[in-house]
A protein has these predicted regions:
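Noncatalytic carbohydrate-binding groove/subsite architecture in carbohydrate-active enzymes
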Residues: 114-264, 326-336
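Aromatic-lined substrate-binding rim segments of carbohydrate-active enzymes
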Residues: 5-75, 117-138
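Alpha-helical scaffolding within the catalytic cores
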Residues: 33-41, 76-91, 148-165, 265
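Structural recognition of the beta-strand scaffold that forms the well-ordered cores
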Residues: 52-55, 97-101, 138-141, 173-176, ...
């Protein structure tokens, strides 16, 4: 986040007791002791088995600082930065998958206009070198804040000007940030105390993600019709007023069935636009905003959002299938109407069809009749997350919302038939 453009990576290496301290001016005004630096980050990635995405400091850092960080992380031979890494205890370089050249440079990352940032991007990215041709670093350019389509247009225009066509503006991805604020930016609204009107308003705002992808994607198509540049939605999710008694800068919030629906709706949208959306990062993972995990000392609970992600994991590395669903419009206020259902479908490598659906209604179940073209149904397994809109997991009741089996599916001559309960997210595996 905004901390990236104040972070100086050399403050976070070497013995922890000698690392420089700084004030985290963006988040909480607390002292950052830099105990979690480059080595700790890559150790975490290795333990989790995940790809590494590092964000460089373009706002207040130098080109040399960014270049040396990439060298420190990825260069295997003899060089000042590689030697420093070895001195600090890591002989071999790490694999750096993605590198963001600045973060939110339209705002906290420097308050730049798009043309100025784009020229800075051109300069900085030049020195984000690929030291391993077989493991290239994907460069991520700072994209727009929500519906700032001018930013997207101007950044792409400037980065592509006097640039070889096959280099695609010297970028592999263009970021997009969008959060659901039910009541607006200043007073965002409670994570747990909301009514039917706010429920549908929140889901309506979650659905706006599709408009953003389509409109920014249309601009990207003008410069990149082959879709070589990925849309990187690397900050998304629900953002509420913090829980009472917590530091406003720590962004700690609870997580209810509303968040489960926001997650399911948004993931369905990402799936259906996976030709352009190449990465999407929920903000954030633990104890911040729409978390999948909340902790209290040594205790840990899984949120409704976690369980939705768990059901949707089957789409990963699968093949998107064209799908559509008949819907009706529901809601309380005319301005914030929503479709009653959303879906996405994929086929896994083993031939299994994975269907994910969301029922946005607070009071109505819907019978679903599916037509699976050229597919013989032999077996169906289902799992579901559902409950009353305010239901959540707490440290006293950690399993109030969880994944449950869903077996009420009937095979038909054309496909399958079932009823999806109100306020639910459903995953079906069809073989």
């Amino acid at each position: 986040g905004c901390f990236a453009d104040e972070y100086h990576w050399k403050d976070g290496i070497g013995p922890k007791e000698t690392r420089k301290k700084m004030i985290n001016t963006h988040w909480g005004g607390v002292v950052e002791d830099n105990s979690f630096g480059t080595h700790e980050f890559f150790e975490l990635c290795e333990q989790l088995g995940c790809e590494a995405y590092v964000n460089g400091n373009l706002g207040s850092g130098t080109v040399q600082e960014m270049s040396e960080w990439v060298e420190y992380i990825t260069f295997e031979g003899v060089s000042p930065m590689a030697d420093l890494r070895k001195k600090n205890g890591h002989e071999k370089p790490w694999k750096l998958d993605f590198f963001g050249v600045g973060n939110e440079n339209w705002g906290c990352g420097g308050n730049m206009n798009p043309d100025f940032y784009a020229n800075e991007y051109r300069r900085y990215q030049t020195y984000v070198r690929n030291y391993h041709p077989d493991h290239p670093v994907s460069k991520i350019c700072c994209g727009a804040n929500v519906d700032d389509y001018e930013w997207t247009s101007e950044v792409l225009k400037t980065t592509h000007n006097h640039c070889l066509k096959e280099l695609h503006g010297n970028m592999d991805g263009l970021s997009l940030h969008y959060y659901v604020h039910p009541e607006g930016w200043e007073i965002k609204g409670s994570a747990t105390d909301f009514d039917d009107k706010v429920w549908y308003k929140s889901l309506n705002k979650a659905l706006f993600m599709e408009t953003l992808i389509e409109r920014h994607g249309h601009i990207m198509d003008e410069y990149d019709p082959e879709k070589k540049i990925g849309m990187i939605v690397d900050e998304w999710g629900a953002w509420y007023t913090v829980e009472p008694g917590t530091n406003p800068g720590f962004l700690y919030q609870q997580n209810t069935m509303r968040d489960a629906l926001i997650a399911g709706i948004t993931l369905n949208i990402f799936n259906k636009h996976s030709d352009r959306v190449k990465m999407a990062n929920l903000a954030q993972i633990v104890n911040v905003l729409q978390s999948v995990i909340l902790t209290d000392g040594a205790d840990m609970i899984l949120t409704p959002t976690y369980h939705v992600f768990d059901m949707y994991k089957y789409h990963q590395d699968a093949m998107l299938v064209d799908s559509s669903i008949e819907t009706e419009t529901i809601g309380v206020e005319e301005e914030w109407q929503v479709p009653n259902l959303t879906e996405s479908v994929s086929v896994a490598e083993d031939g299994a069809v994975h269907i994910t659906l969301t029922n946005l209604s607070l009071d109505k179940d819907y019978e679903i009749r599916t037509i699976l073209t050229d597919y013989q149904v032999n077996e169906v397994k289902g799992e579901i997350v559902h409950g009353e809109m305010h239901e959540m997991n707490t440290f006293e009741t950690p399993d109030q919302v969880r994944v449950k089996e869903f077996n009420e599916v009937e095979k038909t001559a054309e496909g399958i038939r079932f009823t999806i309960p109100k306020c639910s997210v459903l995953h079906l595996e069809v073989r």
